Amino acid sequence: MKFKDKLKFYVITDSNYSDEVISVEEALKGGASSIQLRMKTSSTRKMIEVGNKLRKLTSEYDALFFVNDRLDVAQAVNADGIHVGIDDMPISKIKEIAPNLIIGASAYNTDEMKTAEMGGADYLGVGAVYSTNTKLDARNLGLDGLKNISKIASIPIVAIGGINHLNVENVLECGVSGVAVVSAIVGAENILKSAENMNELIKKYIK
C-alpha cells in the first residue's frame, strides 16, 4: 500500500479532549489510517514517552505515524513522517537531515502550496476548511478554496479544519486524498464508534 492510501483517515491528538494513547488506540480500532502526535506545550521527554507508545500502536494497526513540527522527536520515536507549518523548519533542511521521512506541509493558499511542493513536501495539509476550536488562529479556506488547490496540486492533499461527520462528505467531494480530524474523533464521547462512523463515510469516496 502506498503512503497516499493511508492518508485517507488522519487523526490528530489533542490532550485537551482525551489522553493521547487511549484516544489513538480507539481511533485505530475504528479505522484511522494515519495518526499525528501534536503536543505543542509538552516537554521533549514527555513527547518521546507518548510517541514511543503511539509508534507501537500504529505499527500494530499498520497505520502511519507522524509527529507535528519536531524533527528530533520524530527521529527519536522512529516515526514515519513529520508535519510542518510555514514557520517551522524548512522542508529542504528536513530532507537533508532525515531523507527517509514522509514530510507533510500545511498550506492555506496556492502560494504556500507551491512553496511546499517546490521544497519537496510529500503531501499537503490544506485548511482550515471550516472554523475550528483546536486552532483558533487558523485562516478559513472554505470548500471553494480547497477545490482550487485540489485541482492544481501535484501531491496528495489532506483537508483539515472543523471537519466532522456532518460535513466530511462535502470535503471529500473536493477530490482530496484524505481528511484530518481532531475534535470529531478524540473529543467524542465514544471515540471508537465515532471513528467507525467516520471511516464508513470516508470509504464512500476513497477505497
UniProtKB/Swiss-Prot annotation:
Q: What is this protein called?
A: Thiamine-phosphate synthase
The top EC class, named as a word, is transferase
User: Which pathway is this protein assigned to?
Assistant: Cofactor biosynthesis; thiamine diphosphate biosynthesis; thiamine phosphate from 4-amino-2-methyl-5-diphosphomethylpyrimidine and 4-methyl-5-(2-phosphoethyl)-thiazole: step 1/1
Specify which residues bind 2-[(2R,5Z)-2-carboxy-4-methylthiazol-5(2H)-ylidene]ethyl phosphate according to the UniProt entry for this protein: 132-134, 162, 182-183
Q: Which organism is it from?
A: Methanococcus maripaludis (strain C6 / ATCC BAA-1332)
UniProt entry keywords in alphabetical sequence: Magnesium, Metal-binding, Thiamine biosynthesis, Transferase
Classification via PANTHER family: THIAMINE BIOSYNTHETIC BIFUNCTIONAL ENZYME (PTHR20857:SF23), THIAMINE-PHOSPHATE PYROPHOSPHORYLASE (PTHR20857)
Q: Which cofactor does it need?
A: Mg(2+)
Comment on bound cofactor: Binds 1 Mg(2+) ion per subunit.
Source organism superkingdom: Archaea
> Record-annotated residues binding 4-amino-2-methyl-5-(diphosphooxymethyl)pyrimidine?
36-40, 68, 106, 135
GO-annotated cellular components: cytoplasm
Q: Which family does it belong to?
A: Belongs to the thiamine-phosphate synthase family.
What EC number(s) does the entry state?
2.5.1.3
Q: Which Pfam families match?
A: TMP-TENI
Q: Name one GO molecular function term.
A: magnesium ion binding
Biological process GO terms, please? thiamine biosynthetic process; thiamine diphosphate biosynthetic process
Please write the reaction equations for the catalytic activity of this protein: 2-[(2R,5Z)-2-carboxy-4-methylthiazol-5(2H)-ylidene]ethyl phosphate + 4-amino-2-methyl-5-(diphosphooxymethyl)pyrimidine + 2 H(+) = thiamine phosphate + CO2 + diphosphate; 2-(2-carboxy-4-methylthiazol-5-yl)ethyl phosphate + 4-amino-2-methyl-5-(diphosphooxymethyl)pyrimidine + 2 H(+) = thiamine phosphate + CO2 + diphosphate; 4-methyl-5-(2-phosphooxyethyl)-thiazole + 4-amino-2-methyl-5-(diphosphooxymethyl)pyrimidine + H(+) = thiamine phosphate + diphosphate
Q: Which HAMAP family match?
A: TMP_synthase
- The entry's Mg(2+)-binding residues are 69, 88
